[in-house]
Design a protein with these regions (language model features):
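Outer-membrane beta-barrel proteins and related beta-barrel translocases across Gram-negative bacteria
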Residues: 1-446
Length: 446
């Protein structure tokens, strides 16, 4: 059996209660019964209960969170920790003086698991920020102190059960927006937007700290300008670096429509970063990879997005992606894409959803791996929509992410508009699988 409960209650405009919990009777349930095509790649189910409260200066959160591991190849020691409970608070006080803000972030979490190290982590970060800006530029300086303490159990003999890490975080951020009119009629606006962020975080030895919920995200333009290269409180990356970026946009003067956006970014290290996660390689380089992004929306109904990551030390590309989309109306779309990540992924992806008439629409997707020289995923489907009900049927053939075997599934969903639906949640699957997909609009009553 499968149970999926989602419920949100607002006690007042500033208080929200949330329950989001799922459970299956056995690990193979999704493969055997196909409850939603996306279920074939799920490794664990989330069980969350949360309360949030917002006031003028404070945001408060309390939650408990557990997971049901349903991937038989994933051991309990590799799965996520149970959170029993977590209490977090974020306070902000603006304009204490001209341009001066203050903040306080605090979090206490009890991490539990059947095997390995568990315990309580308390993370506190007070900070101040000052910002001065004009119409075309800004300068922002930030200073924070981050202290993290642990009370651990089931540690290795001789290990510290109450480690503590404390350090300052200093940053100086600045940017400029330069503009000029271009085009024969001066109806286009080109911008040049350089940005620089200097970040200093002293080194603290963190090899003895556990890893409860911390990871290093893939490098991107957002990551270049964060004050911590890790997500999660178990690691704070040391830094003595300068991140530089520049963006240029082409805009319509009258309506503000963006035709083109191009961005380059790179970080320059004055000292080698030394903080690492257990499986993270040693960093010995003077710069980060070079990141480039291009977004083109100049042509009616067409859009394109390009991304590229270049490793200057190895003189090779680490990541590249190209996505094209043709969308002449909200109910019709064609996508084509290419994605490459060194030693991991190289694949083509083509998808489409197109009306056959006022009530019928066809759709499909094909994903092919160039590295493995085989089709990873393909499906075709039909959708019928009227004023009162909709019917969707999808046939799919794909490589299982769990076993590597080829699986075949057929999904059927009947939706009574405004009431409920019966069968697999194929609409949610289609929204995830086809960029720009939206359900057919309701046909008029006959």
């Amino acid at each position: 059996s499968y149970v999926d409960l989602k419920h949100v209650t607002f006690l007042d405009p500033g208080t929200r209660l949330l329950v989001d919990a799922a459970n299956v009777s056995d690990d193979r349930y999704f493969e055997n019964f196909g409850v939603g095509f996306e279920g074939t790649s799920i490794t664990y189910l989330n069980r969350l209960a949360e309360a949030r409260r917002h006031t003028q200066h404070w945001s408060l959160v309390g939650r408990v969170q557990d997971y049901q591991v349903i991937d038989p190849d994933l051991s309990n020691s590799d799965g996520p920790y149970t959170i029993l409970p977590q209490v977090a608070a974020l306070g902000r006080w603006r304009n204490l003086a001209p341009g001066l803000d203050a903040s306080l972030r605090a979090e206490a979490t009890n991490f539990a698991r059947d095997t390995g190290v568990d315990g309580v982590r308390v993370d506190v970060e007070p900070g101040i920020d000052w910002r001065a800006e004009s119409r075309a530029s800004y300068v922002a300086a930030g200073a924070a102190w981050r202290a993290t303490s642990y009370s651990l159990s089931d540690t290795e003999p001789g290990s510290d059960e109450s480690p503590l890490r404390s350090l300052p975080i200093l940053s100086l951020d600045s940017g400029v927006v330069l503009e000029r009119e271009v085009g024969s009629k001066g109806n286009r606006l080109q911008t040049l937007e350089p940005r620089a962020l200097y970040l200093y975080v002293p080194y603290r030895d963190q090899d003895d700290l556990p890893v409860f919920d911390t990871a290093e995200p893939d490098l991107n333009l957002v990551q270049l300008f964060r004050t911590n290269r890790y997500v999660g409180a178990d690691r704070v990356g040391d830094a003595n670096q300068l991140s530089l970026g520049v963006t240029s946009r082409l805009l319509d003067v009258a309506g503000g429509r963006q035709y083109l956006s191009a961005t380059l970014g790179q970080a320059f290290y004055f000292e080698d970063p030394r903080v690492r996660l257990p499986d993270e390689p040693v960093r010995d380089r003077s710069t980060s990879d070079l990141i480039a992004e291009l977004e083109l929306t100049a042509f009616k109904n067409w859009s394109a997005r390009f991304g590229y990551q270049w490793d200057p030390d190895a003189s090779q590309s680490e990541r590249s992606e190209v996505y094209l989309q043709y969308r002449p109306a909200s109910d019709r779309v064609v996508n084509a894409g290419y994605r490459f990540r060194r030693d991991l992924v190289e694949q083509f992806d083509v998808s489409a959803a197109w009306p056959l008439n006022d009530r019928w629409r066809g759709y499909g997707r094909w994903v092919y791996s160039l590295a493995e020289e085989k089709t990873l995923d393909q499906f075709v489907g039909l959708e019928y929509g009227s004023c009162c009900w909709a019917l969707r049927v999808v046939a799919r053939r794909f490589v299982s992410s769990r076993t590597g075997d080829i699986d075949t599934s057929i999904g059927l969903q009947l939706e009574l508009k405004g009431l409920s639906s019966v069968g697999t949640d194929s609409e949610a699957f289609l929204r995830d699988a086809i960029r720009g997909y939206s359900a057919l609009p309701s046909a008029p009553r006959p």
